[in-house]
Amino acid sequence: MTALRACLFWAASLASAAALAQPGSQPATEPVTQPASAPTTTRAASTPTTTTPTTTTTTTQAAKEKDRFLAVINGRVHTVTGPVLDRATVLSKNGIIAAIGPEVVLPPECEVVDAAGLEVYPGLIAALAGGIHGATNPQDTSNVYGLNMLVALAGGITTALAGNDVAKLTFGTVEDMVVKPAAYVSLSYSTYKPLERAQLRADLERVRTYLRELQKYEREKATKKDAKPPDKDWIKDKFENYRKLLTHEAIAATGAQSTHELREIADLASTYDFTVVVRGAYEGWTVAPILGRAGVRAVISPREKHEPDEQANRPTGSTIENAHLLRDAGVTLAIVPQTATITLWGLAGRDLLQLNLEAAFAVRGGLSGADALRAITIDAARVLGVDDRVGSLEVGKDADIVVCDGDLLHYMTLVRYTIVNGRVAYDKAKESLYAHIRPTGQREVPQFDDQWPRRLEWPGEITTEARRHGGDER
């Protein structure tokens, strides 16, 4: 009997355990997390999602299936490729711009950023950058909670070159980070390495011959039964990259500074009909028409300083008018600072902390404000080959938006919000970086009552000494 009772008790215990293990036998206890809302943003009337013990779709899955809306309202919208719109709305749906205009109707559930009295621009693009993302495969190697990424967002940067990939500054997530893998085909065409130059030309000529034979075969295969395609087994590695260049599937990139190097690059691009981006080009102003006719694109720093060669009988050296002269010749420009990283030292505008200030210095050299803005937005996107997705505020493009408290090229302007893929990635009021600077948003531009060189109020003993030596005590 004792053994029988023990067996019955053991069987009853197994039955109870099996009943508890059945799905739907008890309500889910996992808490539902709601996205945090910024104090300076509001969310239009949203209906909370509820769960019941019998449902098979979790709250997280339902949230992923639901459309995600964000609207920037009441701002002065600079579309860059179109007109400036006063008191307009930019509405995004699932990270893509869905509508722009003064009379956009918002959906019931929509996160709203009120930009009344503020300026709205497309996200800035750093065509040359380091230290924001990982050098290779940014989704796996980037610190999405790092200070460098946050500081870059505070400067309005939403897209940057990461190694050879183009990536978004998706703070806190790696979702939809990579815009374009393998942005460039790197070329070495230095005047100091004649053997490499000769080899590159020979390789390009071989690929061009192959493409011509392939075109001939495509024309003749319908009428000639004995037509044979050219051998393509060798089209791999560097030759596959060159094939993409000559078929305009890829963009080349190289460093070139002097007049002679720039002439050689322009000749190479014209001869083999491919698009090339030159980095540096501080003497580009001396051959600007040649670069423009060859379709060369350039990544430059307007304040790059190089003294002219006194022994040369032609124009040499750098000039602050470089950007202006290149742009007038039809060269597509991307402006970057001299130090294309995030640093916490140096003068304003010398690194990616103030990409906009480097563009402002190009205005000092004669570039128009509109073209300077293009050089850090849509034209920078064209240099990277991603202008179909970023660089301007247009319906169908990624919702990368910067909201700031003044003209983007003004040295006192601060970014209020940076939006990446339709999500607020930076909010000035919520981060400690600049929250203490003009927290109420009021800005008074200082008025200087002196002229350069400034006349200072020197102590009496200094002015007396200056007078003794014939100086001016003013």
Descriptions of predicted regions:
Residues 14-16:
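N-terminal signal peptide c-region/cleavage motif recognized by signal peptidases
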